[in-house]
């Protein structure tokens, strides 16, 4: 049972990255970035497809050389998800991939070069109807801003962003989004808050170089969660030193927790204690693995005893309240006469979830045998 989020989103303009709308109330897009060698076309295509299968809306690909630009052309021809080309230092690479059907160009103000070079990139983007992302990063600010501020600060990131926003404005180009990422949560959040007050272009959120799977997920959840709860953000990436597929899962989990966008199962599970009537931890691990393919938004509560089990089940699509030998089953908040054998919880609960979704989609329900 999913209710609407109370969050009032910041108003922003609309751009399109391929067929994905960004800003102006569009669903917050979740994206990741490949970590393969772009020159290895087969490996990169395979990873893009895996990221897409995980639910990504957009994938970014690093294009560091002209040879990589040629590889990008082949990659683009083999995938269907919108691709963003990540461009640093050599603006001519952006001009090349623009001809190859890229869906968005990411440029870094800290290293892309002079206004003349930016003008060339804008001209190519305009010619091919491609949006641009101005990607400011606390680790690669322009040298003069480093000297002015001494160290990265929200004001420094804002000045870098606005410097290039104003260039695009002078060039009468408004098809762009902006990010002001940093590895420090407060630095990034402060910069995004300042930027959100200055412009109405879509904002791409991220805590850059957040860390490994655990620490990076926590840091991203805190930082992105603060901004999203304030209505700031139109697209996001969770940056992890991990499999990019995990970035998509964590990204959707963050949106799901704020009731902004739901995909797949929202599990509600107790941490377990001596009152548990079945092994909650093992049950959850198995259910998460077996139901990973589900994309339909469904809330499932798995509580090991009757203290909180019935209450959580009342607000879940499917709920399990632990009891001796056979646990209570709830569907749409209503307790069922049938009960679930504690020795076979995973198989039976999986069946109920799939049956629930089949009925919701008007498909043939699965026949589940339940111990009465």
Curated annotation (Swiss-Prot):
It catalyses: (2E)-4-hydroxy-3-methylbut-2-enyl diphosphate + oxidized [flavodoxin] + H2O + 2 H(+) = 2-C-methyl-D-erythritol 2,4-cyclic diphosphate + reduced [flavodoxin]. GO terms for molecular function: 4 iron, 4 sulfur cluster binding; 4-hydroxy-3-methylbut-2-en-1-yl diphosphate synthase activity (ferredoxin); 4-hydroxy-3-methylbut-2-enyl-diphosphate synthase activity (flavodoxin); iron ion binding. One of its GO terms (biological process) is isopentenyl diphosphate biosynthetic process, methylerythritol 4-phosphate pathway. Binds 1 [4Fe-4S] cluster. It comes from the Bacteria. [4Fe-4S] cluster binds at residues 270, 273, 305, 312. Transmembrane segments: none annotated. InterPro entries: Dihydropteroate_synth-like_sf, IspG_bac, IspG_bac-typ, NO2/SO3_Rdtase_4Fe4S_sf. Its EC number is 1.17.7.3. Pfam families: GcpE. Its cofactor is [4Fe-4S] cluster. Pathway: Isoprenoid biosynthesis; isopentenyl diphosphate biosynthesis via DXP pathway; isopentenyl diphosphate from 1-deoxy-D-xylulose 5-phosphate: step 5/6. Belongs to the IspG family. Converts 2C-methyl-D-erythritol 2,4-cyclodiphosphate (ME-2,4cPP) into 1-hydroxy-2-methyl-2-(E)-butenyl 4-diphosphate. This is 4-hydroxy-3-methylbut-2-en-1-yl diphosphate synthase (flavodoxin). It comes from Pseudoalteromonas translucida (strain TAC 125).
């Amino acid at each position: 049972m999913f209710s609407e989020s109370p969050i009032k989103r910041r108003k922003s303009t609309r751009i399109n990255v391929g067929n994905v709308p960004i800003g102006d109330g569009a669903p917050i897009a979740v994206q990741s970035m490949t970590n393969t060698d772009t020159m290895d076309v087969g490996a990169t295509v395979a990873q893009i497809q895996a990221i897409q299968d995980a639910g990504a809306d957009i994938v970014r690909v690093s294009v560091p050389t002209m040879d990589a630009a040629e590889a990008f052309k082949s990659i683009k021809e083999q995938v269907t998800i919108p691709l963003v080309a990540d461009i640093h230092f050599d603006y001519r690479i952006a001009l090349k991939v623009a001809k190859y059907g890229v869906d968005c160009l990411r440029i870094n103000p800290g290293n892309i070069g002079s206004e003349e070079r930016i003008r060339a990139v804008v001209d190519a983007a305009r010619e091919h109807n491609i949006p641009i992302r101005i990607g400011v990063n606390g680790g690669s600010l322009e040298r003069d801003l480093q000297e002015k501020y001494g160290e990265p600060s929200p004001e420094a990131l804002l000045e870098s962003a606005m410097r290039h926003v104003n260039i695009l404005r002078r060039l009468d180009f408004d098809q762009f989004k902006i990010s002001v990422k940093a590895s420090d949560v407060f630095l990034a959040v402060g910069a995004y808050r300042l930027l959100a007050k200055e412009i109405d272009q879509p904002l791409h959120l991220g805590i850059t170089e957040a860390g490994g799977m655990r620490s990076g997920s926590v840091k991203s959840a805190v930082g992105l969660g603060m901004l999203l709860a304030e209505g700031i953000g139109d697209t996001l990436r969770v940056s992890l030193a991990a499999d990019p597929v995990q970035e998509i899962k964590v990204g959707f989990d963050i949106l799901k927790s704020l009731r902004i966008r739901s995909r797949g199962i929202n599990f509600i599970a107790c941490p377990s204690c001596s009152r548990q009537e079945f092994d909650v931890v093992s049950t959850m691990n198995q259910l998460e693995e077996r139901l990973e393919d589900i994309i339909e938004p469904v809330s499932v509560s798995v509580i090991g005893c009757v203290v909180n089990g019935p209450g959580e089940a009342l607000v879940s699509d499917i709920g399990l309240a632990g009891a001796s030998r056979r646990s209570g089953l709830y569907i749409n908040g209503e307790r069922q006469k049938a009960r679930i054998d504690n020795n076979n919880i995973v198989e039976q609960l999986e069946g109920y979830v799939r049956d629930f979704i089949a009925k919701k989609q008007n498909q043939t329900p699965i026949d589940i045998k339940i111990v009465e």
